[in-house]
A protein has these predicted regions:
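Extended recognition/assembly regions associated with phosphoester-bond processing machinery
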Residues: 1-181
């Protein structure tokens, strides 16, 4: 059985749960790179999660995958290295799911945020939707908005892949998210 059934978490020590961990996962380019090549990065994240946090926010910040389609092209039709999409999908699972599972085992509040990249916005969105179905106990933001905002305590953190240049990025944040700003 491939799907993870929803489960309740039991935190080890509620006294430790007083902070938020923001996990940024930008430009992994799975398909060009493998989960194994990122094992030190993944292990560092898993070790950090052992500290337990009140909130964990996992940000898929674009270009999780190297290509967006079976023709090994990006969203702008740029041909990249040969990429096998089914293998890339499995590699992404090997990298991302242990992080989600560890976060769920050690934190009462886990959120996943998808942002569009310039290589893979469609397949990464589909992967985010897959994670939304597989892990319903997490909060998910899978909207296709280019700019996202995560509020932690009284702090607003703005998230984007960064490939779309905006002259007035600060003004854009304030306009799109006036309450948070």
């Amino acid at each position: 059985e491939q799907y993870t059934k929803p489960f309740d978490i039991e935190c080890i020590d509620d006294d430790k749960l007083d902070s938020t961990l923001l996990i940024n996962l930008p430009d992994l380019h799975i398909g060009y790179n493998t989960a194994d090549e990122y094992s030190k990065y993944q292990n560092g994240i898993l070790t950090t999660l052992e500290n337990q946090y009140e909130n964990v926010v996992i940000c898929l910040l674009g270009d999780l995958f190297h290509a967006d389609n079976f023709q090994s092209k990006t969203i702008h039709e740029t041909r990249v290295n040969d990429t096998h999409i089914p293998n890339s999908w499995e590699e992404a699972i090997l990298f991302v799911e242990p992080i989600i599972q560890k976060a769920l085992a050690t934190s009462p509040n886990v959120k996943l945020v998808y942002t569009r990249g310039n290589h893979d916005e469609t397949i990464s969105w589909a992967f985010s939707k897959y994670l939304e179905v597989k892990y319903p106990q997490c909060e998910h933001d899978v909207s296709i908005d280019q700019l996202k905002c995560v509020t932690i305590d009284k702090n607003a953190i703005f998230l984007t892949h960064g490939h779309v240049k905006k002259k007035n990025f600060v003004q854009l944040c304030a306009t799109l998210y006036p309450q948070e700003w």
